[in-house]
Amino acid sequence: MSGREKIEAAFSLEGTREIPAVICYEGIYIRDHWAQLTTSPWWHPYVPNVELQMAWHREVIAKTGQDWFALPGFYSLEDRESITIEARPEGVFRRDKRTGAVERLVEPRVGGWTALGEVESIRPTELAETTEEIDALIPVPAAFDPGRRTLNGQNDLAFALLREYGDYLFPIRHVSSPLWICYSLWGFEGMMSMIATRPNLVAHACERSLTLGIRAVQEAAACGAAGIWIEECLTDMISPEAFASLNVPFVRRLVEEIRSLGLKSIYYYCGDPAGKWEQLLSVGADALSLEESKKGFLIDVEDVVERVNGRCAVLGNLDAIELLERGSEEELRAEIARQVAAGRRNGSRFIMSLGSPVTPGTTVERVRLYCDLVHELGAE
């Protein structure tokens, strides 16, 4: 079976004969392991040239060995006519001849830290406190034109990757859940305060955010994606009642849109699912993905499978730090075998994955070993 066939089978009621191997957030993995993964210079993800982009994508796909890949966006044809990347002794610059603007590109930092080594978090100086302010910050997109990005060339890189890999790897894109998007509106403290004191305003923000999520899903379908990864963070910190009213209905509608377009949905819920299991399953996603045990909570894949009981596919949650990065090969093999066995008890509706992104300290060879072991141990 190809990787795509394995994943498609894992979503089916019959399950898959061969367990697929994936990592979550391959963009983080690529950023943190660029020099190990490709011979291309660090600025090539910015170049307005499809073949140069394809060159580093080919190297990454060949070295990683997983069964899916993320479909990127790209410059329009007009942008490609006007934008150049210039590597100079003093740095790398992006020039736009339409405006004369010159932007210095900064090499991405391992771990995603700022130049000062700080974590980047959102702390707005003023909070949006009215529906009008929210509407101004989250404008509703114009009517969707499914052919626009194809005609203007923004899908060209995605189409090139699909021509080369789409028959045997499963193409995905990422969206955020509507409530999680509220973090970008209010920051952590503001989001939590609004959920507690202004739930009607939060619901309005979620309604607006849902339009952005639906548009992202429509664009993903138009460029050839087969699956959507729905990311959600911080919602383990709110009550089950707030979760039921401010999160579940909006994620359910996002899932329904994904299904209506013929795509599969993967709901990645970050944090402790205690007290919210049935709500998580009630959104109707095609698959559920959870973190590994950490931060004081326990998520055992065997317990996940018992709770899901075949109602949807389950993604594995291999520990990205203690096992993938630091464990022995024997420990890694044993945990993959244990999780695969648990997945078989979910009717083989199972995709082996990690609970969190690959860490900067994990080698490329180790990630390839993980994928190879899954393919070995996941074969019937």
State where each predicted segment sits:
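Generic hydrophobic, aliphatic-rich segments that mediate packing or membrane embedding
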Residues: 53-57, 88, 154-157
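Short active-site-adjacent helix-start/loop capping segments
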Residues: 29-32, 69-71, 77-87, 103, ...
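Short, charge-rich binding segments
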Residues: 60-63, 82-87, 160-164
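Segments that shape or occlude catalytic/ligand-binding pockets
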Residues: 32, 36-79
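A contiguous, low-structure linker/loop signature
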Residues: 77-140, 168
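Active-site loop segments of alpha/beta catalytic cores
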Residues: 1-35, 42-43, 124-380
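Bulky hydrophobic/aromatic packing residues
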Residues: 62-69, 97-103, 108-109, 136-137, ...
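Compositionally biased, intrinsically disordered low-complexity regions
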Residues: 5, 23, 29, 75, ...
